[in-house]
Structure formats: C-alpha cells, structure tokens
C-alpha cells in the first residue's frame, strides 16, 4: 500500500483499472490497524488489477478534502480513475468492494 500525496494521486488512479484509498489519521490507531489489515488482504489477491493507497488526513488535509469523506477511517473506491464510492468504517470487505468495482457493479 502506497502513501499518497497530491503530487502522485493522478498517476496512481490511472495506472490500473481500479483503486482503493484508505483515508485515516494517526490518532485513530485502533481503526487504522483494522482497515490496513483489510486493505492488505485485498491487495494480496487483487494487486495485479488494482492499486492500494493511503492518505493521512492530518498530514495531507488538501488531498483529504478532495474526496467526499466525512469521517475516518474511510475507503474511497475508483474505477478508471473516477470515484465510484466512499464508505466509512473500519470493518469493510475491501476485496469484495473492489471486485464489484472491477465488474462495473455499484459498491454498497
């Protein structure tokens, strides 16, 4: 999982057909660990078809503001460089959501 900045997010989103970006903050250590684990599990299976990134909302607030998230942790899902949805909460099935994104189905 790559740590993203405003400077590299464009290439990151265009590099593969799908992407998941975990938005978090260091002060939310418990939820951060749970979501990172879900991201790592999904990355093991889908790394050839999807990119996995992370944004620390405190370190890069401008990038965090560019995505419609209202709380951390959140995961934003992209298809062909375009945002298709963002979900709040640590207990997400990132793999399932990315598989839906890759098929062209909506996430829920």
Task: Describe every region a protein language model picked out.
Residues 18, 67-77:
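Structural micro-motif
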Residues 2-5, 23-25, 43, 47-62:
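Thiol-based oxidoreductase modules, predominantly thioredoxin-like and allied folds used
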Residues 28-31, 75:
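The canonical Cys-X-X-Cys-His
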Residues 30-46:
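Typically the conserved alpha-helix immediately C-terminal to a functionally engaged Cys/Sec
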Residues 1-19, 95-108:
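N-terminal leader/targeting and pre-domain segments
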Residues 17, 24-29:
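Short pre-active-site segment immediately N-terminal to redox-active cysteine/selenocysteine motifs
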């Amino acid at each position: 999982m790559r740590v993203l900045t405003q400077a590299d997010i464009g290439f990151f989103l265009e590099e593969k057909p799908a992407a998941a970006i975990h938005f978090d903050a260091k002060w939310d250590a418990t939820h951060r660990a749970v979501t990172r684990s879900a991201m790592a599990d999904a990355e093991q299976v889908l790394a050839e078809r999807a990119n996995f990134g992370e944004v620390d909302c405190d370190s890069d607030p401008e990038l965090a503001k560019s995505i419609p998230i209202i709380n951390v942790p959140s995961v934003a899902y992209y298809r062909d460089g375009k945002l298709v949805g963002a979900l709040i909460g640590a207990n997400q099935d990132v793999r399932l959501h990315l598989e839906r994104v890759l098929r062209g189905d909506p996430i829920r």
